[in-house]
Amino acid sequence: MQDISNHTPMIQQYLKIKSQYQDILLFYRMGDFYELFFDDAKKAAELLDITLTARGKSNGESIPMAGVPYHAAEAYIAKIVKKGLSIAICEQTGDPNTSKGPVERQVTRIITPATVSEEAFLDNNQDSILVSIFEKNNKYYLAYTSYTQGKIYLVKTLTSLNELKNTVLKLSPQEIITNSRELAQQNPFKKPIKALEEWYYSNFEAKKYINDSLDTNIANNILNLYKNDKLTTIGSILSYLTNILKDTPRHITDISYEQEQDTLNIDINSRINLELDNNSKSSLLSIIGKCKTSLGSRLLKRYFSNPTRNLNILATRHSIINSLGENQHFLKIQDVLSYISDIERIISRVALGTVKPKDLVALRDSLEQLPILKKLLSEKNTPEITNINNRIHQLDELVTLLDKAIIENPPTTIRDGGVIKEGFDKELDELKSIKDNSYDFLIKFEELQKQKTGISTLKVGYNRVHGYYIELSKQHADKIPTEYVRRQTLKASERYITEELKNFEDKVLSSKEKALAREKLIYDTLLKKVIEYYKQIQETAASIAEIDVLANFAERAIKLKLSQPKFNNLAKLELKEVRHLAIEHNIDEPFIPNDTLLSKDTNTLQIITGPNMGGKSTYMRQVAQLIFLAYIGSFVPASYADICDIDTIYTRIGASDDISSGRSTFMVEMTETAYILNNASAKSLVIMDEIGRGTSTFDGLALAKACAEKFAQIGAFTLFATHYFELTELAKQYPNVCNIHFEAKEYKDNIYFMHKAVTGAAKKSYGIQVAKLAGISQDVLESAKQNLYNLEKKQQLTESTQVQAQFQLEPTTQNPLQQKLDAIDINTITPLEALNILFELKKR
């Protein structure tokens, strides 16, 4: 630590505390403000758009300073946290009246992007995820916590950086911690990440924090169930939370292991390509996700992150969707759900000590809806719905307690009181009555003093600095009674106090202090009572989320005309009248649906040709989106869907330069293609859109053919769109390859797209007609037509087009004469040998 002896005592204190939190902003409490100094002040001024000032000098230099009001700090902190930064809150813990030198201060809380619970800091519809990555021997052990959910999840051991990146980005964490400084420095995730000290990833410390933080039975089970490396990863989260909270994270009550083999895997590029869950209005999530509660919205996002292949789970979801869809019963349920607040996060705030009085009112109002919800669910007497209903706890006793205790519209915090309802506590009511009755006393006292002095302008008042006073103008100085003691002198008046008024003041102020202390005690006792229901409320919240998602699926099924998918073990994917929901939603004319059939018994690879804008990309995407929807338990946009076991969806759709890594569009395309080729299996769905465009025609065609052949050999269900018509010949070479194309019609030099998939290969690409639609000028179009004529008839425009025209899909063999000539070593051959070879070649 640098020498700080030349600084003022207060700045010395600040620098000592700041040295422990060098990488985060320090909010240093001074009176009614949080102040920031030096580099923190400069950074905060820029981030928060607040004034950067200076606080005198220390060590001979001006001290940069910026600050935010204590009462408004939450809004400023929210801005910082949402930018991925962390904050240390340093409060005054000493008594200013007894302190010698600077008031004692301590960091009471650290706020990081993933460890916040206050409503202002959180996205209601998204989990707050903290990921821990433990790197050891080129393996990655990963765990994560949904902070306000009170759970830790273990993920399977990962063996490659690419696999790690896909897993982490799928979770979309707010914050990442790791033991690897190299990983933190590289940050391939582009998320807030920090490398922690080694002890956070000590197996000994991990077991200690597991025992200290978790219920004894849970801790023992975890210690017996998992090996050291997984325990280390769990322990790193618990130790980090303990350090952040400055307390044991008792709200963590569950640790579970995610079974990777039960999920449909989709890498991050494919998620982006398919527009599954990004923030755009055309994403699948924005169309499917119409949940009524934040609880349901977050659960739906978890479904999107981890689609399940467990057919029992899917059958249960489908059964509930059908039941709720009968007579549109979901409408009644959704109406009740719309009145239920985020009780999962509210009870977490109670456990973490960040709950606000209004949260308790919201909790009460939400719990009041549970009897109605349970009655509606009981009307659908199916085992699946009954199971959910049994996990919704009707907490009438807690509702009654909160209703009696908290006023209807409480203040933001308990700090100044005014939260507890009159009649709840007799002692508190008595203390408040002293203050409430003070007005009557002051009116009578003022009237008595006016009579006593004969001064009609005499006033009795109060301010926070000087307390109660009697105010008289200076012109009445000769009428001041002897018992009046001067308290304050103003420009035109004097303020006095009497012994009677002083006694009243002491009594009132004492009652205020006692009432506030009593109210805080009642409030704390109330919170302890509420926390007794923690597990029941968490379980209730989870069940409400589940029924919200499934009611949403039922509503979407009717609104969007979705049908229930079937699942088979016959290696067959049969889809009829499939639609693309986003496009259907955004166009005025009717959407043209298409059928898809892929089967191990017929064909597994479709070569798809046809004009741009003809519907090839839409066709491929809608198949992938349908399978995805089926595996989250939703109904699907098709009149019929029979789906086999698909374990992974891969897509290669579009590309752009990766400038930061120095990679061209073609390099990005080839990297993604290599990943798919190396990982695809017979249980994969592969979407390949126009591969080989970023290089020469010859190279592109060769690569596209080789990739298509590989997918045919693997047996992966593959939709392969291409402009290389030569690839349609593959259907003659491979029995599991077929051709389909999208038709277009020409009429009076215009083109009309049919958007219908038809068996066979396309005969034209209609590129010039599409260019016309795009607005290319007529002179350029005429020139293009002439060029096309030359290419098709003369094939002499350029050397490369000659090569393309002559290019055959079959492998070429070298001429035997050429082989013989290549084998001759002209440096060692004799003239006689040369004549003999020439004679032999001539005979051939």
From Swiss-Prot:
Task: Name the residues that bind ATP.
Answer: G610, P611, N612, M613, G614, G615, K616, S617
Q: Keywords of this protein's UniProt record, alphabetized?
A: ATP-binding, DNA damage, DNA repair, DNA-binding, Nucleotide-binding
SUPFAM superfamilies listed in its UniProt record: DNA repair protein MutS, domain I (SSF55271), DNA repair protein MutS, domain II (SSF53150), DNA repair protein MutS, domain III (SSF48334), P-loop containing nucleoside triphosphate hydrolases (SSF52540)
**Single annotated GO MF:** ATP-dependent DNA damage sensor activity
For this protein, the record's InterPro entries field holds:
DNA_mismatch_repair_MutS, DNA_mismatch_repair_MutS-lik_N, DNA_mismatch_repair_MutS/MSH, DNA_mismatch_repair_MutS_C, DNA_mismatch_repair_MutS_clamp, DNA_mismatch_repair_MutS_core, DNA_mismatch_repair_MutS_N, DNA_mismatch_repair_MutS_sf
Q: Name one GO biological process term.
A: mismatch repair
Query: Coiled-coil segments, which residues?
Result: none
Q: Say if the entry is tagged with keyword Nucleotide-binding.
A: yes
Q: Which domain of life is it from?
A: Bacteria
Gene3D superfamilies per the UniProt record, alphabetical: 1.10.1420.10, DNA repair protein MutS, domain I, MutS, connector domain, P-loop containing nucleotide triphosphate hydrolases
**Pfam family of the protein (one):** MutS_II
The residues that cross the membrane are none
Q: Name one GO cellular component term.
A: cytosol
Stated family? Belongs to the DNA mismatch repair MutS family.
**What is this protein's function per UniProt?**
This protein is involved in the repair of mismatches in DNA. It is possible that it carries out the mismatch recognition step. This protein has a weak ATPase activity.
Q: Would you tell me the protein name for this molecule?
A: DNA mismatch repair protein MutS
User: What organism does this protein naturally occur in?
Assistant: Francisella tularensis subsp. mediasiatica (strain FSC147)
